[in-house]
């Protein structure tokens, strides 16, 4: 039987919803924070919701015991299933950046933007269903989600997206970074810099989460790891190095995919990593890398 969840701390679990898309089974997941109340961070796309509910039950909770669904941002792979989830998590409120509120209520523009960026993958993620306005709570800097023994702090972290926020649990030093500090998947740190990418805002957000002095970082893709501040710093160095190279090649007229191929060939760890991938995983990661490189090449500092 496949692993359904992983304990990060005694109060935090990574839930594998097993999104039924080849190579995405453990690329997308959610975090469960439990005290007297319970919160899910990033429910994932619509096709992940049946698996998410199954794992919630597996850890000993009922769907009605989820009090909050917190969205680090509204991109379809993190939040596309929110409306679907709320039909099952009947007592939950949604916490989201103020810029994301209107897109939860009316997801038409979000759906179009997702199709424009991701193409056929959107149909595999599933329809983005609307969320009722009275179930939405706006997350601001300083907003605290009180779960009893756990107090989750909202920290606005634009850069990856204008509507991005992170979540910090100070008692254990756990940071839920969404896509602010990159992807750490299959042992490799990678960029998450889709267009329209904002370098200055991203660097400011990295400073902001570093100042929290986190001990554990929980990536949106995927898992919880110690030595959080060093990991954030490693992402900063990777980001600046790739940004400078991508900007230079953009001015020289190189194509997006041309720069992607250059990165794969010139970065030893990336080259070895891509050589190990099967067809589906390579398609997933090549697409993600192309999206990130496009953001770097078209960014304004």
Predicted feature residues:
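Conserved beta-strand hairpin/beta-sheet module of binuclear metal-dependent hydrolase folds
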Residues: 2-59, 167-177
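Active-site neighborhood of phospho(di)ester-bond hydrolases with catalytic His/Asp-centered motifs
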Residues: 41-44, 67-73, 95-97, 157-159, ...
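Core dinuclear metal-dependent hydrolase active-site scaffold
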Residues: 32-33, 142-169
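C-terminal regulatory/interaction regions
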Residues: 248-301
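Active-site metal-binding motif and surrounding structural segment of the metallo-beta-lactamase
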Residues: 50-99
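Metallo-beta-lactamase
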Residues: 104-155, 203-210
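Divalent-metal (often Zn2+) His-rich catalytic cores of metallo-beta-lactamase-fold enzymes
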Residues: 203-254
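Metal-dependent phosphodiesterase/nuclease catalytic metal-binding core
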Residues: 165-220, 230, 297
